[in-house]
């Protein structure tokens, strides 16, 4: 009798886990389908940063540009200038205020920079997250406890139009990005190339062994 009960419990548990995994795969496939529907776009964004208690602590604005596959650029104009560029292989973060560039490989950066997923079809990238869907909102949660993020939400309609995205960090701080003035005009590949400015320090994280 005891063995029968244990077998029943294991069967139910396995069935539940299989259902969750299948739903996760469905959500990933649907999100990828929507993201791939629009090959390139440019948009202005407004950023709102809130503390874990919900208090607004910062706001910002800038431009977000994507060209699939694997290319994106984010120009942050306020509260201070920053530039983030993915050239498909490397992820560049330029902070003019401190005259420093940090560069990492896209493969290594996907954990801490989920924006990479908005342009990637690499299965290795997607397997690092659990994905659930609620209408036009997709919730991505990193599987690794070492990830600095707790959650990454993507708002995208069935036609592939990205409306916004948000992150929740481990400490509860949230970053909300709302997109507007979205266009799908052709974007030059030169936008996604980064040249290190003169007299700027380079922190090359590609050399750091994981």
From Swiss-Prot:
Family membership noted in the UniProt record: Belongs to the LolA family.
Classification of source organism: Bacteria, Pseudomonadati, Pseudomonadota, Gammaproteobacteria, Pasteurellales
Pfam families referenced in this protein's UniProt entry, alphabetically: LolA
GO cellular component, one term: outer membrane-bounded periplasmic space
Functional summary from the UniProt entry: Participates in the translocation of lipoproteins from the inner membrane to the outer membrane. Only forms a complex with a lipoprotein if the residue after the N-terminal Cys is not an aspartate (The Asp acts as a targeting signal to indicate that the lipoprotein should stay in the inner membrane).
Protein name as it appears in the record: Outer-membrane lipoprotein carrier protein
A biological-process GO annotation: lipoprotein transport
Signal peptide annotation: 1-23
Keyword Transport: yes
InterPro entries: LolA/LolB/LppX, OM_lipoprot_carrier_LolA-like, OM_lipoprot_carrier_LolA_Pbac
Subunit structure: Monomer.
Compartments where found: Periplasm
SUPFAM superfamilies: Prokaryotic lipoproteins and lipoprotein localization factors (SSF89392)
Keywords, alphabetical: Chaperone, Periplasm, Protein transport, Signal, Transport
Highest taxon listed in the record's lineage: Bacteria
Xref: PANTHER family: OUTER-MEMBRANE LIPOPROTEIN CARRIER PROTEIN (PTHR35869:SF1)
